[in-house]
Amino acid sequence: MSSKQEIMDDQRFRRVSKDPRFWEMPEKDRKVKIDKRFRAMFHDKKFKLNYAVDKRGRPISHSTTEDLKRFYDLSDSDSDLSDEESKVLDEKRVKEKKKQTKKETKSKTPIEEKKKETKKTDQKDSINKNDLNNSERIQKMKNSHKSPKIDSEVSPKDSEESLQSRKKKRDTTDLSVEASPKGKLRTKDPSTSAMVKSSTVSGSKAKREKQAVIMAKDNAGRMLHEEAPEEDSDSASELGRDEESEGEITSDDRASADDDENEDEEEEEDGEEEEEEEEEEDESDDESDSGPDLARGKGNVETSSEDEDDLADLFPEEPGFEHAWRELDKDAPRADEITRRLAVCNMDWDRLKAKDLLALFNSFKPKGGVVFSVKIYPSEFGKQRMKEEQIQGPVELLSIPEDAPEKDWASREKLRDYQFKRLKYYYAVVECDSPETASKIYEDCDGLEFESSCSFIDLRFIPDDITFDDEPKDAASEVDLTAYKPKYFTSAAMGTSTVEITWDETDHERITTLNRKFKKDELLDMDFEAYLASSSEDEEEVEEAPEGEDGVSIEDGKTKKSQKDDEEQIAKYRQLLQVIQEKEKKGKENDMEMEIKWVPGLKESAEEMVKNKLEGKDKLTPWEQFLEKKKEKKRLKKKQKALAEEASEDEIPSDVDLNDPYFAEEVKKIGIKKKSMKSAKDGATSEEETELEKQKAEMALLVMDEEEDSKKHFNYDKIVEHQNLSKKKKKQLMKKKELLEDDFEVNVSDARFQAMYTSHLFNLDPSDPNFKKTKAMEKILEEKARHREQKEERLIQAVERAQQDTGKPAQKQPMDPALSMLIKSVKNKTEQFQARKKQRIK
């Protein structure tokens, strides 16, 4: 303490006690307050990491939990209190302390109180007697040692010497008592024992008074006269004699006074304890008046039990809700067995679908691994709760009173509890090809957050002997990743303070489809699908209806619809193949039959088909044109063969005798046939003749392509070399007749190569080192520049037309009035039917 006082008295360090920069931060402000949701990190093994060596390589035994406790602490309710409430708390604590001290004093028996009163009276009598004796001795000392220079002052040295001499004498008396036989002494008079008692009791207080006299600092007391030590020695000798006489008395009565001294010591201890309690009460009163001194560390530390009691007085107790934050899988048993099936639990099933999980797990599967399917099944708990909710709604909503405010904490936490339970209504089964792929997915995805949804993936292995008899709510075996769009959502119960109940929430996919902007064609298709149906579909539905069982859920109907769609597509493909085969058969036959089915919009569809056929001839690709040419060649060959066979039949062999009557008749028949053929040809219409001429012209063109002898091979590299030669070398090659002249002319207007002028893929770069300048290349570049100029002119003209036609309304294509009236009538009838249905429900 003395060293600290010296440091504080030093002027160099005096600023430390007053400057707040040198004050230590209290623990409440030093640690970061965290919510009780994160208390698992203090005891959970996932957050614990033991250190064997520190950063300098020295061996230590340290863990991360110690670091967490060093920097983090659970939030106390005191941190949220205001200043006025904290004052009220301090006052209550002081009052409670006073009450406790009063209760302790009252709890003592009245016999003990009487004993204390008697002891106190004895102490007071002994103190008075000692005071009288001490005052007489002091007067004797003053009378015997009167000096001219010092009147009423005692030197500290003399007082110390006198005390030491007294102590020595008392020690000798104690030794004499101990040395006496059997350690027992008899007292003759009771007065002497009383004197001994009074002297022993008052010993402690007399010592205190003498020490106070010695410690008194006085300048006059230090400046003593030279004769003072002699006088002090005389006075000390006289005092020693008096003490010897007293010592004899005490030695005679020592044995009888031992018991009394022990009692007196106990009384002194009781008295000291009472004084300490009174001092503590005074200090507490002072603290309550002045308040806690936080700068000196007073009032900082308070017991948690007192804080809780005080808070319980201020705030009424509320029903506690312990949510399983990130601990929904704490009850799941742990097993070492790895299987090829995984269960996905505790997810937001109102938003997630099977295809979302399949897309996720496909991105985490190992090389060569396959995820066959993902199916979502309802759990037993979910089935029971959903049945109850269909009848009376969620139980948690019924427990909330109607008059409860919107921001009521208890009602909000009840809704949160319901949302947590709703995560267990379903579970998904992921089927993999092998246990290795399942374990890889488990290691990578278990505990992972799905996007930014605040819902964490809880994976568990499913034993091989477990089977699932329920029909799945949703299933997915394939996902088109090119067209798949991920879902971005946040579950309110897990991530926000405000809770939104999802019991009667509309399907989010339905909301997105309704909010999407549709085109006119899409709307018409939707109207056709919704309001118009063929009779065959109705019959199929009627046939399939009795096969199903009663009480089929909506989810089962969805799966059946998907199966029906697949079957319908297969049936359509089969019908198309049959129609194609029938058409081919009918084309071969002479008698043609036609079937006409009246369908809404048949006229428009027929017109479109005709246009497509007419435009198809112009839009044929080079390959299709080549195939058509081949077909025409085959047809020509067949015709030539037929003509040759007819000619061979017409030819008459040389061995035949025309004079023979049999052969003469046959020759006449052949002549008649030829005449009939000629007459048939003559009777042909002019239209047939024109068609025949066209066919002949096309055939001539085809034959010309094959019969052209002007075709020749060329070497492009040699042409480029000869073109870049000098004039002398060209003349030399001309003489030798080895110069290759580039007679090839590019057909720039060929429609097959129009992409060279429009597409960036066929761009010609003259700065490229592989570019070789020829006449054909120059023509292509010129044509490209011409196309570019034409395009710019067209754009300018289009802009001018748009500016002129801004005021003119766009002409709409007229729709078939009969079809539009049919759709409108069906719409009106459905609206009327729904309106009547609503009125009945009300």
UniProtKB/Swiss-Prot annotation:
Record's protein name: ESF1 homolog
Positions of the UniProt region annotated as Disordered: 54-317, 534-568, 631-657, 674-693, 785-816
Keyword Nucleotide-binding: no
One GO cellular component term: nucleolus
Self-association and partners: Interacts with ABT1. Forms a complex with ABT1 and suppresses the ABT1-induced activation of polymerase II-directed transcription in mammalian cells. Disrupts the interaction between ABT1 and TATA-binding protein (TBP), and suppresses the ABT1-induced activation of polymerase II-directed basal transcription in vitro.
Subcellular location: Nucleus, Nucleolus; Nucleus, Nucleoplasm
Swiss-Prot/TrEMBL keywords: Acetylation, Coiled coil, Nucleus, Phosphoprotein, Transcription, Transcription regulation
GO molecular function, one term: RNA binding
Residues where Phosphoserine is found: 75, 77, 79, 82, 135, 155, 180, 198, 288, 290, 304-305, 605, 648, 654, 686, 726
A biological process term (GO) from this entry: rRNA processing
PTM sites of type Phosphothreonine: T303
Tissue spec. comment: Ubiquitously expressed.
